[in-house]
């Protein structure tokens, strides 16, 4: 099908049954998004043998495992994955157990500028581990199902923060969604107090009345933010419709350019 579509740029695979291990070779594709949720046997492995113009690769499903082997994707800049994703860039294996875990880096992984994470729990340790391995990362989008039990960081990451080997280059952070728990507050304040070039942070919430916003602007220490020009906003979370949570999130944030 792809070979017969020489102008195809965007490929959205949803509940595709029958083909468990499709292989892709395409000179024109710029975006691939996969939702392999299905009651019937669906895609288990996606092999991208060659996609020289691929810029965006996203796995949308939280609940069904998908092994993605990206063998040649030299222009890839936007990567989306969930707890059910296992990624291989060339010889670099990126595994997801309860969250992201990096095993070394390939050249393609080093060029990632935008990371979209579908996490079962909002876990600061896992996010920091990813950041230390993506040196060009500028945009971070996170959708989480619940808060992690503990995101304390001041003692644990004191040495890392002051290290010359670690610098946060993030300019954009979007969190879906912010519940206002102690764990959420600790997660967000890590970036508020340490992201020196941050330009925009959006926290999706289920209430943004004046009282809630005032309380949490104080708890998040926004007056002490490392980037004085950063715009930090609380936005009401939209209702989930359509294909999947990750899909809606990517559409709303213009990550998938349909």
Regions found by a protein language model. Give the residues of each.
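Short, conserved loop/helix-junction motifs that constitute active-site signature segments
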Residues: 134, 163-168, 193-196
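Leucine-rich repeat
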Residues: 1-129, 138, 142-160, 176, ...
